[in-house]
Every structure is written in C-alpha cells, then in structure tokens.
C-alpha cells in the first residue's frame, strides 16, 4: 500500500498517469499487461515477490522490458530479500529497496540501492547533516554520493543490527 500511495501522490502532483499490471489466475503477469510497458512509460515499479500470494515475479524480464523502452525499473524486495539471494547487478534494476524489520533487523531500518549514474543526477530531498559539502551566503554545494542523501543523524544502532540480521540470514 505504501508504494501505491507514493505513486498516487506523484501522479497527483505531476499529472502523470498511473497504470497497473494485473496477474492471471496462476499469479503471473499476462503478455497484455507486459505490453503496457511502452515508450510512454517512465517508471516501472513492482514487488519481486507478492506479499499476498507469495508469487515470485520474473524480475529480470520486467526490468529488461522497462529498460527496452527507456524506463527506470524500481524493485521492492521487502518480501523477497529475507528468503532468497538478492543480486542487484544481475537483475540490472535501477533501484532496489527492502525493509530491515522483515529480515530480523530493527524497526525503521532498510536499504535503498540505486545505480550511481542515476543517483549522481538527483537532487537531495532532505537537507542538513553530512549531505552538505560547503555553505556560502547565497549557495550550497552538496556532498558526493552517498553522503548527499544522508541528512541528519544516522541510525547507527539500527544499521549495525541490520548488518547482523543480514549476516544471520546469509548463513
């Protein structure tokens, strides 16, 4: 739901159109729905594994389809990452996110992976802390990646706990 609400807000603010891909009776995307990814598509966002039915999605196929039309592919790995190996380079997604609490980590933790080339061209959305490199009276220079997206104090304890949870699940 959080993912959907976010995209609804983006569409309301920008005038973009939100479209959906539906599953067939066996829990797979139909060719008709995959054909909705066309040259007008800017972003394809989807879950690697359904949190309702547990169906695995063909991540590499969907990412390749998105890239074939110049769209960005965003994969929600909250349901998949705790249970299966995740290789963002292999799936070639542009962004990949998962929450820590679904991996035995603490609440309010998670990971957002983004391709460096895309992140480098993005503006920070939160201001302060380590994301600032230098401040002048009339301008500010933002820090390099990954720091330009790390405003405020970091949740060090949560990051350490998430690292331990990842190590535990790897074994």
Regions found by a protein language model. Name each.
Residues 1-171:
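Pyridoxal 5′-phosphate
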């Amino acid at each position: 739901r959080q993912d959907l609400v976010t995209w609804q807000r983006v569409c309301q603010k920008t005038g973009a159109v939100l479209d959906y891909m539906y599953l067939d009776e066996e829990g797979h995307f139909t060719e008709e729905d995959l054909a909705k990814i066309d040259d007008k598509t800017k972003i394809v966002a989807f879950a690697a594994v359904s949190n309702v039915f547990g169906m695995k999605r063909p991540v590499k196929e969907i990412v390749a389809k998105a890239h074939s039309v110049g769209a960005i592919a965003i994969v929600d790995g909250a349901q998949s990452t705790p249970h299966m190996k995740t290789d963002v380079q292999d799936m070639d997604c542009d962004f990949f996110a998962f929450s820590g609490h679904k991996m035995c980590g603490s609440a309010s933790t998670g990971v957002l992976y983004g391709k460096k080339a895309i992140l480098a061209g993005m503006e920070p959305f939160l201001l302060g802390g380590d994301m600032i490199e230098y401040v002048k009276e009339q301008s500010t220079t933002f820090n390099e990646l990954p720091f330009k997206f790390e405003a405020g104090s970091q949740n060090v304890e949560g990051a350490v706990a998430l690292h331990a949870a990842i190590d535990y699940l790897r074994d």
